[in-house]
Amino acid sequence: MAFPTTEILSALIEPLAASHKFDLEGLKVTKAGPKSAVAIKVDSDSRPDLDQLEVFSQEIGELFDAAEQRGELNFGAGYTLEVSTPGVDNPLTLPRHWRRNRGRLVALDQDGKKRVARIGALNDAETHVVLIERNKKLLEVTTLELAHSPRAVVEIEFAKPAQDETALAESTFDEATA
């Protein structure tokens, strides 16, 4: 049997991830003999901590070992298993990414034009998100249709956000757009 593909591993990992209330955000398989690696990225609305990731990693290792013993997987000379969460440089591509980063700054890059806004609430259908931008002393509220979202990445912020921005980001979609 050949080294397992991402599709085969995803089919094994996703039910276990779901049992931990994790979403499988990324899976990368690198075949390089004894230096082969399987890198798994998971996330959840409650942000997995290191202890949860350790337990999940152990269970994935046991799952892979059992599948190898049954002849369903073959990692060959071995592999390194890496389990982590997506970093802040991970693009926001799905509604859950926007929901999980509510209140944070996001850098949007559309047609070479960059802008920075604070992420607010999503509408009930999770098709639009509120964006809050400061224009001098005024706050401007716009909505972004997620289906046509430009490249968006969370911005690291060192200063505490202004109270009026935070309050607007915490308001509901309908309140913010009224």
UniProtKB/Swiss-Prot annotation:
Q: Which InterPro entries match?
A: Ribosome_maturation_RimP, RimP_C, RimP_N, RimP_N_sf
Record keywords: ATP-binding included?
no
**One family name in Pfam for this protein:** DUF150_C
Localization in the cell:
Cytoplasm
* Primary site of residence: cytoplasm
Name the domain of life.
Bacteria
Which UniProt keywords are given for this protein, alphabetically ordered? Cytoplasm, Ribosome biogenesis
Q: Does the keyword Cytoplasm apply?
A: yes
UniProt-listed GO biological process terms: ribosomal small subunit assembly; translation
One GO term describing the cellular component: cytosol
Which NCBIfam families does the annotation name?
PRK00092.2-2
**Protein family:** Belongs to the RimP family.
Q: Outline what the protein does.
A: Required for maturation of 30S ribosomal subunits.
This one is known as Ribosome maturation factor RimP
Q: Which organism is it from?
A: Corynebacterium glutamicum (strain ATCC 13032 / DSM 20300 / JCM 1318 / BCRC 11384 / CCUG 27702 / LMG 3730 / NBRC 12168 / NCIMB 10025 / NRRL B-2784 / 534)
